[in-house]
Amino acid sequence: MSAVGNEPLARQALAFVLAGGRGSRLLELTDRRAKPAVYFGGKSRIIDFALSNAVNSGIRRIAVATQYKAHSLIRHLQMGWNFFRPERNESFDILPASQRVSENMWYVGTADAIYQNIDIIESHNARFIVVLAGDHIYKMDYEVMLRQHVDSGADVTVGCLEMPRAESSGFGIMHIDENGWIQEFLEKPADPPPMPGKPDVSLASMGIYVFDAKFLFDQLKRDAEDPSSNHDFGKDIIPYIVKNGRAIAHQFSTSCVRSGDDPRAYWRDVGTVDAYWAANIDLTDVVPELDLFDRAWPIWSYSEITPPAKFVHDEESRRGQAVSSLVSGGCIISGASLRRSLLFTGVRINSYANVENAVIMPYVNVGRGARLKNVVIDRGVEIPEGLVIGEDPELDAKRFRTTEQGISLITQPMIDRLNT
């Protein structure tokens, strides 16, 4: 089976993005927002990567299911993703949990999130449904995955990547035959099975699925009638198809969007504070694995109108400077030193402050003489003058949230408690 005429398969698809999760391992970073709404990379939110992949792949019909503390996410989507044109058969639907099936039921699983909106999805008359997780960082051409789905004749195509076994227990793990057909699918096993010939590696699901639309709707209706089901793709839908139908694996390495000749396939979960900090700080490398400067595959997002970043004062002990750092618009580095750090919009770092290995979210104000190292600072925090973080691990652990790798997470309530 081939595409209709020369029309890309992506133009016949609808992307359904699951964006309702909290991401509790991010601790206080998700106290006020869902994980897909967490800031990333200086200008974006995490969800922008899945959405940008869809748009860059040619998909022009998108639906986003939201649930946990969705206001920040919905506002971002309304401001940054409002460029779709219905007259061109484009659409962008935001679908908050709204008890559409029962007045006592919110979304109870990933599959249920689509089932509860099945009438809306069916109305778009898409040939394919591409199910996406809205909380991962990667660049991928979904057209390649759609092509494999059609050429193979599979009931479902599951995106997958090789992952160290030690890090795989939080993902669906699959075993495939020599042709890529999935023989077994285990959702989040405590002891992930290894790949044949690779004892330290498991084949993990990316939470990306391609279905023929009618087949998916039939599966969702069947699953909804099963009282023993969790109504979840990883726990129920995919294992059922593996057992009773045809499920094929799509290797991320074949559709990953790389920069130049870089052989690495970049994908990050950023599900913990340590992983989140590391993925952001990695962007300050001379040649980072994730290329945000790639004009051929841009990461679309809402961008505030701000003046350029400003660096002021040029005295020996009071010089506004930044080395190996990303500094967003509206920031002012006023006689302060910044090294290997990433600043989001509107951050101000005042005179004599020293900041190193820091991820600082929008509109943070760092007081004079502060010394900050190995930190993640939440939006809008006021850092007092002279505050020192990152030099005394025991003291940091008493005052802030510190991780196994020594990263301190700073929020305004933590700062407020310093004076009590």
From Swiss-Prot:
Function recorded in the entry: Involved in the biosynthesis of ADP-glucose, a building block required for the elongation reactions to produce glycogen. Catalyzes the reaction between ATP and alpha-D-glucose 1-phosphate (G1P) to produce pyrophosphate and ADP-Glc.
GO molecular function: ATP binding; glucose-1-phosphate adenylyltransferase activity
Record carries keyword Cytoplasm: no
Binding positions for alpha-D-glucose 1-phosphate per the UniProt entry: Y107, G172, E187, K188, S205
Protein name as it appears in the record: Glucose-1-phosphate adenylyltransferase
InterPro entries documented for this protein: ADP-Glc_PPase, ADP_Glu_pyroP_CS, GlgC_bac, GlmU/GlgC-like_hexapep, NTP_transferase_dom, Nucleotide-diphossugar_trans, Trimer_LpxA-like_sf
UniProt-listed PROSITE patterns: ADP_GLC_PYROPHOSPH_1, ADP_GLC_PYROPHOSPH_2, ADP_GLC_PYROPHOSPH_3
UniProt EC number: 2.7.7.27
UniProt source species: Bradyrhizobium diazoefficiens (strain JCM 10833 / BCRC 13528 / IAM 13628 / NBRC 14792 / USDA 110)
Pathway(s) annotated for this protein in UniProt: Glycan biosynthesis; glycogen biosynthesis
Keyword Oxidoreductase attached: no
Keyword terms of this UniProt record: ATP-binding, Carbohydrate metabolism, Glycogen biosynthesis, Glycogen metabolism, Nucleotide-binding, Nucleotidyltransferase, Transferase
Protein family membership: Belongs to the bacterial/plant glucose-1-phosphate adenylyltransferase family.
UniProt cross-references to PANTHER family, sorted A to Z: GLUCOSE-1-PHOSPHATE ADENYLYLTRANSFERASE (PTHR43523:SF2), GLUCOSE-1-PHOSPHATE ADENYLYLTRANSFERASE-RELATED (PTHR43523)
